[in-house]
Amino acid sequence: MKVVILAGGYGTRISEESKFKPKPMIEIGGMPILWHIMKEYSYYGFNDFVICAGYKQHMIKEWFADYFLHTSDVTFDFTQGNKMIVHDQHAEPWRVAVVDTGLNTMTGGRIKRVQKYIGNETFMMTYGDGVCDVNIAELVKFHKQHGKLATLTAVVQEQQKGVLDIGQDNTVQAFREKSINDGAIINAGYMVLEPEVFDTISGDDTIFEQTPLRELAAKGQLMSYVHRGFWQCMDTEREKSMLEKMWASGRAPWEVWNQQ
């Protein structure tokens, strides 16, 4: 199953760093937050990624092209014609398609633009600026069991956008843009989607969190997988610093691939 990651945003609220690189390439513990997200999916056996790039998309492509240089010790032997020797080579079991989905394309438009890379298959989608410790295997199992077109991961947060009204059977009954209460249940990404969802997206200007998700909710085709564990997006410098401190502590909740 392919994993689509939205990685085309500007990240304008995160310090000077976001002026020079795409938001998903902003680093936590020396590695882009995009890498952290991919590591979690990979831990659960999902290694086929489609990155919806946009702003400074060349930086994402160059980072993957030079991945060995980021993760291995190397020797450059100029006496042998600029030969490079990679030591203790570490290769992720990943297949990564980095797709330029446009500079100002909305979230739905970016998903629509990578349809040809997905085909007629169930796929996953998440945002390139949020990490969590959701059990992705259980998320996929839940999606397959209910048989609806879409599942999103829902978490409890204070005063956020994308607020959900959820029924007793976990059906999303309404999708609102603004919270009116603290402790609201919100959309955290980490979605599982059927290919029919592409039909709800009209073009580049479609915001996926508006018309498509609202239509799916109205038709009873949007389910929520309620996650009671850790989730955090990286929208501000304060949130970035908080994630950095968690990583430096050696006990980052989302680092499931290293937990015993």
Regions found by a protein language model. Give the residues of each.
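Structural beta-sheet core signal
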Residues: 3-5, 51, 125, 150-153, ...
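Well-ordered alpha-helical segments embedded in enzymatic catalytic cores
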Residues: 33-36, 110-113, 212
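Conserved beta-loop-beta/alpha segment of the NTase-like Rossmann-fold superfamily
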Residues: 60-168
